[in-house]
Amino acid sequence: MLELKNIRFDVQEGSQEIEIIRDVSFTIPDNKFVVITGPNGGGKSTLARLIAGIEKPCGGAIVLDGEDITEKSITDRARMGISYAMQQPVRFKGIQVLDLLRLAAGKRVSVADACQYLSKVGLCAKDYINREVNASLSGGELKRIEIATVLARGTKLSVFDEPEAGIDLWSFQNLIQVFEQMRDSIKDSSILIISHQERILEIADEIIVVADGMIDRMGPRDEILPSLIGTTSAVGACIPMGGKPLSVPASDGSAVPGNKKGGEA
């Protein structure tokens, strides 16, 4: 279980301190598929980086299974079972997919096991196992290979920052199928996705809406999703693939624009 307790994060812009995250608290229980959504610039991606250890909070605590990990590095958190998938996966010239899966797992992975991980994410193993992770791969292929590395790692908490970014509609549909399979087979772990996409929100167990650096609302999907879809309360973000963000009223009825803080997600 992951807990964020009164998390605060500021950045310095010239002589000013800008609040990005303001006193945010929430819990991600075990065996849950959680999606964080909200307007562009609301602080969603910053929260993902804070959880992964890429950024350190200015206040508050991050607790994993009862242990305070606030000061732990990204490497320490990875060893403890937190994985982080970036919006744009890195290409590794000269490294084959099999090697990448073994590096991710931190141990010797058999070819048979590697093929199984690739098959789970919808890739034909024999076509990819010996391919280089380079520019010859499409964005959708890279995303699925990155998810395969998360499966190989066997983490307690898998964090995906806008996995739909930079991929086409066909790849996005395949990606949804992969996440549905991960949700259905989830055991002794949790999945956290930062996303604007309605199709991803539809498969969540819990939804957390973040706006202007704060929790606007959170709860079970069936309680939160109806207020986000098909109306101007679509959080500037809950949109079909290829759609445009909307302006959003917050839970108190005030308007939340679809873009804030210069594009910070």
Where are these regions (language model features)?
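Conserved structural motif at the start of ABC-family nucleotide-binding domains
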Residues: 2, 19-21
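The feature captures the beta-strand-to-loop junction immediately N-terminal to the Walker
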Residues: 37-39
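Helix-to-loop junction immediately C-terminal to a conserved catalytic motif
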Residues: 52
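Conserved ABC transporter NBD signature motif
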Residues: 60-67, 113
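ABC ATPase NBD coupling module
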Residues: 68-83
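Q-loop/switch helix immediately C-terminal to the Walker
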Residues: 88, 94-110
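Walker B catalytic motif
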Residues: 162-163, 170
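Conserved beta-strand-loop-alpha-helix hinge in the C-terminal portion
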Residues: 214-239
